[in-house]
């Protein structure tokens, strides 16, 4: 479980929770909840819940089902089913008529799982560009993750050796993507994303990791 404090244009704006677990040896599940609070909650009310289920083979992950509930947007519900046998993604909005998207390859996932796969690489080299095949809404494309030189980063949980990366994705429902998403992963086998910076619909958002439980007996909480 990862817990984040979110700042919007420099002021406290909300919280985010992310959980990755394996209910069975060959199955993974990711759960995300993002909620805006305070002034940000007034100007940009947000309560999104995302659930992803997929197949797991070691570090290889394949999304099979994705759903997103946008509570503050009149309960807008998005569902995607990845039919891996046919190589297509079936998408439905608000339980309406399903729409078959373009053909997708076996390595294509939605953005969250795609980033989990990219960060699980055994080694990162400064200057390296990693391709990220994604389907995002109606878009099917190859994003990029650019690796930057290692550095030290002070966080609410203390100081970490980190690997900064820039993630280049196309515009989506949440991200404006006028610039790349910046992520700082811990430089260890956990690759914890301790800080994330991105553009959103109205302004700039930063998320700092304030608590984690990696499921291996390591946990820390700054609260």
Features from the language model and the residues they span:
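Hydrophobic, well-structured mid-protein blocks that either form specific transmembrane helices
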Residues: 77-121
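Acidic, serine/threonine-rich low-complexity disordered tracts
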Residues: 1-84, 121-223
């Amino acid at each position: 479980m990862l817990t984040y404090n979110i700042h919007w244009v420099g002021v406290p704006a909300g919280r985010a929770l992310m959980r990755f677990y394996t209910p069975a040896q060959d199955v993974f599940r990711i759960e995300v909840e993002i909620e805006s609070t305070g002034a940000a909650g007034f100007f940009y009310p947000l309560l999104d819940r995302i659930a992803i289920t997929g197949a797991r083979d070691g570090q290889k992950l394949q999304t099979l089902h994705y759903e997103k509930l946008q509570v503050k947007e009149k309960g807008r519900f998005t569902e995607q089913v990845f039919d891996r046998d046919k190589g297509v993604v079936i998408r439905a909005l608000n339980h309406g008529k399903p729409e078959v998207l373009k053909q997708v390859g076996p390595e294509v996932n939605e953005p969250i799982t795609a980033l989990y796969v990219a960060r699980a690489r055994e080694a990162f080299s400064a200057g390296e560009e990693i391709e990220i095949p994604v389907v995002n809404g109606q878009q099917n494309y190859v994003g990029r993750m650019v690796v930057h030189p290692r550095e030290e980063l002070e966080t609410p949980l203390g100081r970490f050796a980190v690997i900064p990366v820039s993630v280049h994705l196309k515009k989506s429902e949440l991200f404006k993507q006028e610039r790349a998403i910046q992520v700082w992963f811990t430089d260890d086998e956990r690759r914890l994303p301790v800080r994330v910076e991105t553009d959103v619909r109205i302004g700039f958002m930063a998320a700092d990791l304030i608590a984690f439980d990696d499921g291996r007996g390591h946990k820390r909480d700054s609260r």
